[in-house]
Regions:
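Nucleotide donor/acceptor-binding cores
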Residues: 1, 71, 146
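NAD(P)+-binding Rossmann beta1-loop-alpha1 motif at the extreme N-terminus of oxidoreductases
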Residues: 1-52
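Short, well-ordered alpha-helices that flank and scaffold nucleotide-derived cofactor binding pockets
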Residues: 17, 21, 87-91, 114, ...
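Rossmann-like NAD(P)(H) cofactor-binding subdomain of soluble oxidoreductases
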Residues: 29, 53-138
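Helix-loop-beta segment of a Rossmann-like dinucleotide-binding subdomain
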Residues: 93, 137-152, 202-211, 259-268
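Rossmann-fold dinucleotide-binding core
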Residues: 104-186, 190
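Active-site-proximal catalytic alpha-helix in oxidoreductases
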Residues: 184-212, 216-229, 256
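NAD(P)-dependent Rossmann-like dehydrogenase/reductase catalytic/cofactor-binding core
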Residues: 218-316
Length: 316
């Protein structure tokens, strides 16, 4: 199976490593030239809790324009970049190519549907901590149990066959992936969790464990989660609150010492965040369904104001 990984940073490289170990032929597409050049010259160093190995045989490119038609294209760019990246990726997408989003947030499948038919779109999310330790070096910190869930936007023979093939390839490479008939509960669970610790930590400029340890921070996270669960239930996805309650100690244990990605974007690097597909998406769905989401709405507005005014902020 010929697969293009569009966006081969930390998560994209880790996912590609598992797929390469599972037997896929991989094209890594990323504008990070030093990373692509290092992989092309020396292979990809892949570190996991079990040890380190060097994986070879990758094709690398800064663009999808000249890599030929793929069997599958996996998007691993920031959700805010999906439309622009898809426009650039179309040269390698043929009439039978299956397009997969394993990105953060809600609505990526809707953006993909602007470019290809929904019967060949898969979407989902991973539960794997990842790191790019340097050019050509990626690190996987997998969760226990199933590490990745994905499914079809519309179940049909083509999408189901592609999903099962992707599941088998991930599993053969050591990633415990699951192709699910209805992937929405897993996507919403991750989005709700992210909207809590990511959004609140970004506003507070705190690590995850510090946000949860402070009674006010913890209270805000719980409000964000409860609103997200109410929206999910209104969509017919089910009651996710019991799952979120069980998830809290795992989040603190596994992510507690880190500034989450939104805090890194907003505080450390002054980059555009994914607020619009996390808290912002929950708020939009809530408005559409008549479900109040005051905490998610306020956090969305605060982060949006911050990222709209990086050049004007007082730095001391």
């Amino acid at each position: 199976m010929k697969i293009a990984m569009i966006g081969s940073g930390a998560a994209g490289s880790v996912f590609a490593a598992y797929l390469r170990k599972g037997g896929a032929e991989l094209w890594l597409v990323d504008k990070y030239k030093a990373h692509m050049d290092k992989i092309a010259a020396d292979g990809l160093v892949f570190r996991t809790p079990e040890g380190e190995e060097v994986l070879t045989g990758f094709h690398t490119s800064a663009t999808a324009h000249d890599i030929g038609t793929m069997d599958m294209v996996i998007l691993m760019v920031k959700a805010t970049q999906t439309a622009d990246v898809m426009a650039d990726t179309m040269p390698c997408i043929g009439p039978e190519t299956v397009v997969v989003s394993l990105q953060n947030g809600l609505g990526n499948d809707e953006v993909l549907a602007q470019f290809v038919e929904t019967d060949r779109i898969l979407y989902g999310s991973g539960l794997i901590g990842t790191e790019l330790a340097g050019p050509g070096v990626c690190v996987s910190k997998p969760e226990k149990g199933i590490q990745m869930h994905f499914g079809a936007v519309h179940n049909n023979p083509k999408a189901d066959a592609a999903g099962k093939a992707l599941e088998a390839c991930f599993q053969a490479g050591g990633c415990n992936a699951s192709f699910d008939e209805d992937v929405r509960p897993y996507i919403w669970k991750k989005v709700i969790a992210n909207s809590g610790y990511n959004g609140v930590s970004a506003v507070m400029r705190l690590k995850v464990k510090e946000t949860f340890a402070d009674p006010y921070g913890h209270d805000i996270v719980m409000h964000v989660w409860k609103e997200g669960c109410a929206v999910a239930q209104a969509l017919g996805i089910g009651d996710l609150w019991p799952l979120m309650e069980k998830e809290e100690p795992n989040i603190v244990a596994n992510l507690g010492n880190y500034y989450p990605s939104m805090a890194q974007d907003a505080v450390l690097h002054q980059r555009q965040t994914e607020i619009s597909v996390l808290n912002g998406a929950i708020a939009r769905y809530g408005e559409r369904l008549g479900v109040p989401t005051p905490s998610n709405t306020v956090i969305t507005k605060v982060i949006s104001c911050i990222q709209n005014n990086y050049d004007k902020q007082y730095l001391g």
